[in-house]
Amino acid sequence: MKNAALCEALPLLATCSHEIPPTPHTVCFVFPPALLLSPSKLTLLNSRRVASRCVIIIDPRLLRLFSCSRPQQLPRDKNQSFAKPSFSFFFFLLTSLLSPF
Protein backbone atom coordinates (compact mmCIF):
# COMPACT_ATOMS: atom_id res chain seq x y z
CA MET A 1 0.00 0.00 0.00
CA LYS A 2 1.39 3.38 -0.92
CA ASN A 3 0.79 4.93 2.52
CA ALA A 4 2.47 2.11 4.45
CA ALA A 5 5.57 4.30 4.81
CA LEU A 6 3.70 6.43 7.33
CA CYS A 7 4.14 3.61 9.84
CA GLU A 8 7.92 3.61 9.68
CA ALA A 9 8.47 6.27 12.34
CA LEU A 10 5.39 5.54 14.43
CA PRO A 11 4.73 3.20 17.35
CA LEU A 12 2.93 0.23 15.90
CA LEU A 13 -0.32 -0.86 17.48
CA ALA A 14 -1.20 -4.21 16.00
CA THR A 15 -4.70 -5.47 16.47
CA CYS A 16 -6.64 -8.49 15.34
CA SER A 17 -9.96 -6.69 15.54
CA HIS A 18 -11.72 -4.61 12.90
CA GLU A 19 -14.06 -3.07 15.48
CA ILE A 20 -11.69 -0.51 17.02
CA PRO A 21 -12.92 2.92 15.90
CA PRO A 22 -10.24 5.18 14.41
CA THR A 23 -9.45 8.52 16.01
CA PRO A 24 -8.61 11.74 14.12
CA HIS A 25 -4.92 10.97 14.72
CA THR A 26 -4.99 7.35 13.59
CA VAL A 27 -3.97 5.92 10.25
CA CYS A 28 -5.73 2.65 9.52
CA PHE A 29 -4.58 -0.07 7.19
CA VAL A 30 -6.96 -2.80 6.08
CA PHE A 31 -5.75 -6.26 5.14
CA PRO A 32 -6.28 -7.92 2.79
CA PRO A 33 -6.25 -5.00 0.31
CA ALA A 34 -9.43 -6.34 -1.29
CA LEU A 35 -11.32 -4.91 1.68
CA LEU A 36 -10.51 -1.45 0.32
CA LEU A 37 -13.24 -2.01 -2.22
CA SER A 38 -15.85 -1.96 0.55
CA PRO A 39 -17.41 1.54 0.88
CA SER A 40 -17.92 1.00 4.61
CA LYS A 41 -14.17 0.52 5.06
CA LEU A 42 -13.11 3.53 2.98
CA THR A 43 -14.09 5.92 5.77
CA LEU A 44 -11.47 4.26 8.00
CA LEU A 45 -8.59 5.26 5.75
CA ASN A 46 -6.80 8.59 5.62
CA SER A 47 -3.28 8.56 4.20
CA ARG A 48 -2.73 12.32 4.40
CA ARG A 49 -3.33 12.82 8.12
CA VAL A 50 -0.39 12.93 10.54
CA ALA A 51 -0.83 9.95 12.83
CA SER A 52 0.10 9.41 16.44
CA ARG A 53 -0.24 5.65 16.03
CA CYS A 54 -0.76 3.08 13.34
CA VAL A 55 -3.63 0.63 13.58
CA ILE A 56 -3.60 -2.52 11.53
CA ILE A 57 -7.14 -3.63 10.73
CA ILE A 58 -7.22 -7.29 9.81
CA ASP A 59 -10.07 -9.22 8.25
CA PRO A 60 -11.46 -11.44 11.06
CA ARG A 61 -11.52 -14.37 8.63
CA LEU A 62 -7.72 -14.28 8.63
CA LEU A 63 -7.35 -14.58 12.40
CA ARG A 64 -6.24 -18.18 11.98
CA LEU A 65 -2.93 -16.77 10.70
CA PHE A 66 -2.32 -14.91 13.95
CA SER A 67 -1.94 -15.99 17.56
CA CYS A 68 -3.54 -12.91 19.08
CA SER A 69 -7.21 -12.65 19.99
CA ARG A 70 -7.28 -9.11 21.37
CA PRO A 71 -5.33 -5.87 20.72
CA GLN A 72 -1.78 -5.84 22.00
CA GLN A 73 0.74 -3.04 22.29
CA LEU A 74 4.08 -4.02 20.86
CA PRO A 75 6.99 -2.99 23.12
CA ARG A 76 9.26 -0.20 21.99
CA ASP A 77 12.84 -0.99 21.16
CA LYS A 78 15.26 1.50 22.74
CA ASN A 79 17.30 1.64 19.53
CA GLN A 80 14.34 2.03 17.19
CA SER A 81 11.74 4.75 16.73
CA PHE A 82 9.08 2.07 16.41
CA ALA A 83 8.58 -1.54 17.44
CA LYS A 84 9.23 -4.05 14.70
CA PRO A 85 6.34 -6.32 13.74
CA SER A 86 6.92 -10.05 13.81
CA PHE A 87 8.22 -11.98 10.83
CA SER A 88 4.81 -13.58 10.35
CA PHE A 89 3.31 -10.11 9.85
CA PHE A 90 5.88 -9.21 7.20
CA PHE A 91 5.26 -12.55 5.48
CA PHE A 92 1.52 -11.91 5.55
CA LEU A 93 1.99 -8.36 4.26
CA LEU A 94 4.23 -9.53 1.44
CA THR A 95 1.87 -12.30 0.37
CA SER A 96 -1.12 -9.95 0.60
CA LEU A 97 0.50 -7.37 -1.66
CA LEU A 98 1.73 -9.91 -4.20
CA SER A 99 -1.33 -12.11 -4.46
CA PRO A 100 -4.12 -11.04 -6.84
CA PHE A 101 -7.57 -10.49 -5.36
From Swiss-Prot:
Keywords: Cell membrane, Glycoprotein, GPI-anchor, Lipoprotein, Membrane, Signal. Residues 82-101 form a propeptide. The keyword Cell division does not apply. It is a lipid-anchor; GPI-anchor. A lipid is attached at residue 81 (GPI-anchor amidated serine). Residues 1-17 form the signal peptide. GO terms for cellular component: plasma membrane; side of membrane. It is found in: Cell membrane. The keyword Electron transport does not apply. Coiled coil: none annotated. Disruption phenotype: Leads to long chronological lifespan. Deletion leads to fluconazole resistance. This is Long chronological lifespan protein 1. It comes from Saccharomyces cerevisiae (strain ATCC 204508 / S288c). The gene is LCL1.
